[in-house]
Amino acid sequence: MAMEYFKGKVKENIELVEGIYSLVVEHEAKINAGQFYMIKTPNTFLGRPISVCEVNGNDVRFVYATVGAGTNEMKKMISGDEIEIIGPLGNGFDINKDYGRVALVSGGIGTAPMLELAKSLRKNNKDIKMDFYGGFRDDIYLVDEIAEYVDEVKISTNTGKHGHKGFVTEILPLQEYDTVLCCGPEIMMKKVVEMCKEAKVNVYISMEKHMACGVGACLVCICKTKSGNKRTCKDGPVFNGLEVEF
């Protein structure tokens, strides 16, 4: 689907756990899992890049963390409000690629795009071997929904409230997989890439960067790779992890 600018009507905006919200906007969209939209609230000058959590019929769902002025204004929006949106943007994950045995690995709000990714991969190949590994600080979210599409779910939390107490990288048996698809904090993805390189496992990561335009013009979101600087919003956000220079 080509990028477009539109004013979407908010259908639902609810808090899933403390500081994490689920925003549903009425909009018919065809996206690649891992793509994102720039979402602008009325009192902010620039939009915020928010990845697509899932597409259901004529609704697009975004799951976001409240971390600044834009997202803190976003959380106050109610059903019927209009919100300015540009997208879909970026490349997303290639769901037609033969990944073999796949591990979906996320950290924190990087869990958001994993739902649409799991749905798309399962729809494209019902026999795919696919497990989900999610790392959270304390409370967990989207896990039950993702579990509907994967074979196995394993969770870690920093506090030990759910699953393994520690980091998600500590519960990831790379020897069981051919490919890792990952999204989360850069420090976590760097560790995952290092582990995959050592284990000779393919890894694709969705980078999270500050963005101003979302269309490749401002060069705020540069990602360093072995083949030169890339624009996260235009050339990414999904990159071959083994090519990224952290």
Swiss-Prot record:
One of its GO terms (biological process) is 'de novo' UMP biosynthetic process. Its cofactor is [2Fe-2S] cluster; FAD. Residues 3-95 form the FAD-binding FR-type domain. Keywords: 2Fe-2S, Electron transport, FAD, Flavoprotein, Iron, Iron-sulfur, Metal-binding, Pyrimidine biosynthesis, Transport. GO terms for molecular function: 2 iron, 2 sulfur cluster binding; electron transfer activity; flavin adenine dinucleotide binding; metal ion binding; oxidoreductase activity. FAD binds at residues 48-51, 70-71. InterPro entries: Cyt_c3_hydrogenase_gsu (IPR012165), Dihydroorotate_DH_ele_sf (IPR037117), Dihydroorotate_DH_Fe-S-bd (IPR019480), Dihydroorotate_DHASE_ETsu (IPR023455), FAD-bd_FR_type (IPR017927), FNR_nucleotide-bd (IPR039261), OxRdtase_FAD/NAD-bd (IPR001433), PyrK_electron_transfer (IPR050353). Binds 1 [2Fe-2S] cluster per subunit. Binds 1 FAD per subunit. Disulfide bonds: none annotated. It comes from the Bacteria. [2Fe-2S] cluster binds at residues 213, 218, 221, 233. Pathway: Pyrimidine metabolism; UMP biosynthesis via de novo pathway; orotate from (S)-dihydroorotate (NAD(+) route): step 1/1. Heterotetramer of 2 PyrK and 2 PyrD type B subunits. Belongs to the PyrK family. Responsible for channeling the electrons from the oxidation of dihydroorotate from the FMN redox center in the PyrD type B subunit to the ultimate electron acceptor NAD(+). This is Dihydroorotate dehydrogenase B (NAD(+)), electron transfer subunit. The lineage of its organism: Bacteria, Bacillati, Bacillota, Clostridia, Eubacteriales.
